[in-house]
Curated annotation (Swiss-Prot):
GO terms for molecular function: ATP binding; ATP hydrolysis activity; four-way junction DNA binding; four-way junction helicase activity. The gene is ruvB. It comes from Rhizobium meliloti (strain 1021). It comes from the Bacteria. This is Holliday junction branch migration complex subunit RuvB. It catalyses: ATP + H2O = ADP + phosphate + H(+). Residues 256-346 are annotated as: Head domain (RuvB-H).
Length: 346
């Protein structure tokens, strides 16, 4: 199963981009309480001074609301919002075109900034720090450096892999913001809001069941809600109940913990083929026929957060929670081996 085919894949899809479902203000935004509280202060201070907000870096797994927060920030600052992504900016001229079209205090959002071309990144440094573009015009002996003054803008960037950002780029963001997985209670509020906007009846138990299986991710909660709505409408149900939500999600192969076939293949392979681990990431990638990046960025964060696996210097290891969830008995020596690995980590 490819990552793109997964119902619970946290990456954006066309159906996820319904603007009417997005919160429009920080007060409407559910979850990330600490980040929202700080952003409110920074936004109000910048607005009162009539200055551009300092550059902001959002860090966290996909689907947690980085793009939505960037849009809300621009709206609350009362400025224009421009959006792009790291892979799209292929050359310096692409970046120059974006920056020179910005007005004073505008917000430029760059998603996946860790995938920015290194040559483009070099151009970004003076733009962020001095609001100037340093461009080389011409080639060979006729080449000359030209400085272009820019409007004072705010760069809001998002990354799922902070470690891939260079230190010079990372240090130029004055406001780093880490986003965390959402609680079931927060996701339940998001599901309720989505159902209300859809005109869909929803019981407390139905909302909680969808929230429990959404992997701590609002984007996945919205996607599951839409699929459960399909089942409810075909069944001519007046509201989504626990029974309808459970039956729909079970038929979609999303289990009680939000794991799908690929997650279970990951855990089962380590359990049955490698005795619970440790096993290296390259071996896992080959066994699943999935890219290493997809495993590290998409599959493993939630499994680690739920306490199903440990990352150790010698490889991935299943925990007692994973064995229990799979309904398998761990080898007799698994607890002792995990204890030794924990000591090695320390």
């Amino acid at each position: 199963m490819s990552e793109a085919a997964r119902l619970i894949a946290p990456e954006k899809r066309g159906e996820d981009l319904d603007a009417t479902m997005r919160p429009q203000t920080l007060d409407e935004f559910t979850g990330q309480a600490e980040a929202r509280a700080n952003l409110k202060i920074f936004i109000e201070a910048a607005r009162n001074r009539g200055e551009a907000l300092d550059h902001v870096l959002f860090v966290g797994p996909p689907g947690l609301g980085k793009t939505t927060l960037a849009q809300i920030m621009a709206k609350e600052l009362g400025v224009n919002f421009r959006s792009t992504s790291g892979p799209v900016i292929a050359k310096a001229g692409d970046l120059a075109a974006l920056l020179t079209n910005l007005e004073e205090r505008d917000v430029l959002f760059i998603d996946e900034i860790h995938r920015l071309n290194p040559a483009v990144e070099e151009i970004l440094y003076p733009a962020m720090e001095d609001f100037q573009l340093d461009l080389i015009i011409g080639e060979g002996p006729a080449a000359r450096s030209v400085k272009i003054d820019l409007a004072k803008f705010t760069l809001v960037a998002a990354t799922t892999r902070l470690g891939l950002l260079t230190t010079p780029l990372r240090d130029r963001f004055g406001i780093p913001v880490r986003l965390n997985f959402y609680t079931v209670e927060e996701l339940e509020l998001i599901v309720r809001r989505g159902a209300r906007l859809m005109g869909l009846g929803m019981t407390d138990e139905g909302a909680r069941e969808i929230a429990r299986r959404a992997r701590g991710t609002p984007r996945i909660a919205g996607r599951l809600l839409r699929r459960v709505r399909d089942f409810a409408e075909v069944a001519r149900a007046e509201a989504v109940t626990l029974k309808i939500a459970d039956e729909a999600l079970t038929r979609l192969l999303v289990d009680s913990m939000g794991l799908d076939q690929l997650d279970r293949r990951y855990l089962t392979m380590i359990a049955q083929n490698f005795g619970g681990g440790p096993v290296g990431i390259e071996t896992i990638a080959a066994g699943l026929s999935e890219p290493r990046d997809a495993i590290e960025d998409i599959i493993e964060p939630y499994l680690i957060q739920q306490g199903f696996i440990q990352r150790t210097p010698r490889g991935r290891v299943l925990t007692a929670n994973a064995w229990k969830h799979l309904g398998l008995n761990p080898p007799r020596d698994v607890e002792a081996s995990q204890f030794r690995l924990t000591l090695e980590d320390d």
